[in-house]
């Protein structure tokens, strides 16, 4: 899918990987980039607007843990304004296994609920035009970082959900693929808590291994968007982009 002149909604488009991806998307010239995030960042929005003045960048506050009804209400505001939306990126995520319920709510349930809400506008069974969903999951959905089992399980669930969405495309008209970053130097990785403190040094241990920058990840993310392959399981690791078969695995080596 060419990004040029498209209308894109990006949930959590101001985070580490998210913000660099927003930059790369804006460079590609969409008509509209609508960013939904929990915390407003006027400086970041201003930077995106200055990067390509031809692109309309809009921000709405959004917490993915709200109800489907609340999300649907927000999306109606956006659809009423834009008329059409081509791509939804679900990017919200936290890495803190102290917060069990919130981890599941943000990383999995939030993705499911946001997707469920947009189906009201896209589902071809309701007369909708269809659409494309890119869900940011994780390589931990392939093989867990076992010291953060809650995070890993939430990402595995999001990946499974995305794979199902892709299989449902002939019914709904909505295609989907997953974006699965490897270890990336973001604030998410620099400091986080393992489950029950089973490994206090887990973040430090991970960063002892080769990583990638958020820019490398973002550039490959845009390539995946352009490829627009329904059902693709994209691995974005060590600055590379690979469409993997489910029989392949990834290991944290710690």
From Swiss-Prot:
InterPro entries xref list: ADH_Drosophila-type, NAD(P)-bd_dom_sf, Sc_DH/Rdtase_CS, SDR_fam
CDD domains listed in its UniProt record: ADH_SDR_c_like
Biological process, per Gene Ontology: alcohol metabolic process
Cystine crosslinks: none
EC number assigned by the record: 1.1.1.1
Residues the entry annotates as binding substrate: 138
GO cellular component, one term: cytoplasm
GO molecular function, one term: alcohol dehydrogenase (NAD+) activity
Binding site for NAD(+): 10-33
Annotated active site: 151 (proton acceptor)
Keyword field contains Cell membrane: no
Record key words, sorted: NAD, Oxidoreductase
Superkingdom of the source species: Eukaryota
Catalytic activity: a primary alcohol + NAD(+) = an aldehyde + NADH + H(+); a secondary alcohol + NAD(+) = a ketone + NADH + H(+)
UniProt similarity note: Belongs to the short-chain dehydrogenases/reductases (SDR) family.
Subunit structure: Homodimer.
Official protein name in the record: Alcohol dehydrogenase 2
Source species: Drosophila arizonae (Fruit fly)
């Amino acid at each position: 899918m060419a990004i040029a002149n498209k209308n894109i909604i990006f949930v959590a488009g101001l985070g580490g990987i998210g913000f660099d991806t927003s930059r790369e998307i804006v460079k590609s010239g969409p008509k509209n980039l609508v960013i939904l995030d929990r915390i407003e960042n006027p400086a970041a929005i201003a930077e995106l607007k200055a990067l390509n003045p031809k692109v309309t960048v809009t921000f709405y506050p959004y917490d993915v843990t709200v109800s489907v009804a609340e999300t649907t209400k927000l999306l109606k505001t956006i659809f009423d304004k834009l008329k059409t939306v081509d791509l939804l990126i679900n990017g919200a995520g936290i890495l803190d296994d102290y917060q069990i319920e919130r981890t599941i709510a943000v990383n999995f349930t939030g993705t499911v609920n946001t997707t469920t809400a947009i189906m009201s506008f896209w589902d071809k069974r309701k007369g909708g035009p269809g659409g494309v969903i890119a869900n940011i999951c994780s390589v931990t959905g392939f093989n867990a970082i076992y010291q953060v089992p809650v995070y890993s399980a939430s990402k595995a669930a999001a990946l499974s959900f995305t794979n199902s969405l892709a299989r449902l495309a002939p019914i709904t008209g909505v295609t989907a693929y997953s974006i699965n970053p490897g270890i990336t130097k973001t604030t998410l990785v620099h400091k986080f808590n393992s489950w029950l403190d089973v490994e206090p040094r887990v973040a430090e241990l991970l960063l002892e291994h080769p990583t990638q920058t958020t820019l490398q990840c973002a550039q490959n993310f845009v390539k995946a968007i352009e490829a627009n392959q329904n059902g693709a399981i994209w691995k974005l690791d060590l600055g590379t982009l690979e469409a993997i078969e489910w029989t392949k695995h990834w290991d944290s080596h710690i």
